[in-house]
Structures are given as C-alpha cells and as structure tokens.
C-alpha cells in the first residue's frame, strides 16, 4: 500500500488509539517519525517509544500516556501537508495556546519545537500542532 503522508498516518494512529483507550500502538518506522516521537516524549505527551528491529520492516512501539483515565494529548493535528506545505520564518512561528501546547517544526538544524527554533533563530516547515 502506498502511503502519501506517513506523518499524518502516525498522528491519526495516535489519535485513534487514545480515543479507544489503548496503552500501546505499533507503526512503521522512519527517521522523521522517531524525531517527532522524541519531542513528544520530552514534552511529556507520550510515556515512551522504542524501535522493534525484529520484523522485516522496522516498526516503532509507542506507549501512550494517560492522566486520571484521560489522554494527555487533547488534540494533535497535521499543519503542513504534501499538497500544501506550510513554511514559517522564526518570527511567524505560532505560540500554541500561549505556550501550553507545542508546534513541531522541521528546520535546517533538525526537528524541534517552535520554542527551540525561535531561540535558535531558524524557521522551517510547520509539521504539526499538539495540545
């Protein structure tokens, strides 16, 4: 099956698993997905993730995080899509819910949060927004 937007697929898997109250999900692996999941873990939105190299195709297991039975991620959405890319300069990077949420940006210095990109003085492609 040809997947045109693997990042949107990953975000949809997370959203669907949390609405079904699943503890763990598996998905195909890529460097960009691992970078996004690393940021989600650092920001406290997921418990953990690890790569499973045992399969023919490498996959990632993600352990989702809940607080009092409610998902920690209230909304997760893709901003830049294959049909309509969204690039922002360092001055145009959004502040999500006045700093309570996080926007993930792909820059020339790697994948980082909008706060880190603003401090580093770089802009880039706005991948997704998480609250």
UniProtKB/Swiss-Prot annotation:
Keyword hit for Ribosomal protein: yes
Highest taxon of source: Bacteria
Biological process per Gene Ontology, one example term: translation
InterPro entries: Ribosomal_uS8 (IPR000630), Ribosomal_uS8_CS (IPR047863), Ribosomal_uS8_sf (IPR035987)
Originating gene: rpsH
Keywords, alphabetical: Ribonucleoprotein, Ribosomal protein, RNA-binding, rRNA-binding
Complexes and interactors: Part of the 30S ribosomal subunit. Contacts proteins S5 and S12.
Keyword Ribosomal protein among record annotations: yes
GO MF annotations, alphabetized: rRNA binding; structural constituent of ribosome
GO cellular component assignments: ribonucleoprotein complex; ribosome
Homology family: Belongs to the universal ribosomal protein uS8 family.
Function description: One of the primary rRNA binding proteins, it binds directly to 16S rRNA central domain where it helps coordinate assembly of the platform of the 30S subunit.
Coiled-coil boundaries: none
SUPFAM superfamilies (UniProt xref): Ribosomal protein S8 (SSF56047)
Protein name: Small ribosomal subunit protein uS8
């Amino acid at each position: 099956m040809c997947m045109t937007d693997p990042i949107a697929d990953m975000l949809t898997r997370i959203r669907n698993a949390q609405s079904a109250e699943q503890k763990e999900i598996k998905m195909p692996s890529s460097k960009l997905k691992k970078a996004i999941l690393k940021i989600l873990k650092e920001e406290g939105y997921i418990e953990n993730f690890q790569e499973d190299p045992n399969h023919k195709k490498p996959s990632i297991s993600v352990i989702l995080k809940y607080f009092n039975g409610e998902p920690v991620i209230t909304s997760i959405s893709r901003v830049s899509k294959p049909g309509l890319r969204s690039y922002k300069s360092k001055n145009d990077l959004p502040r999500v819910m006045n700093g309570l949420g996080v926007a993930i940006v792909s820059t020339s210095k790697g994948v980082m949060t909008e706060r880190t990109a603003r401090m580093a003085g770089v802009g880039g492609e706005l991948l997704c927004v998480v609250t």
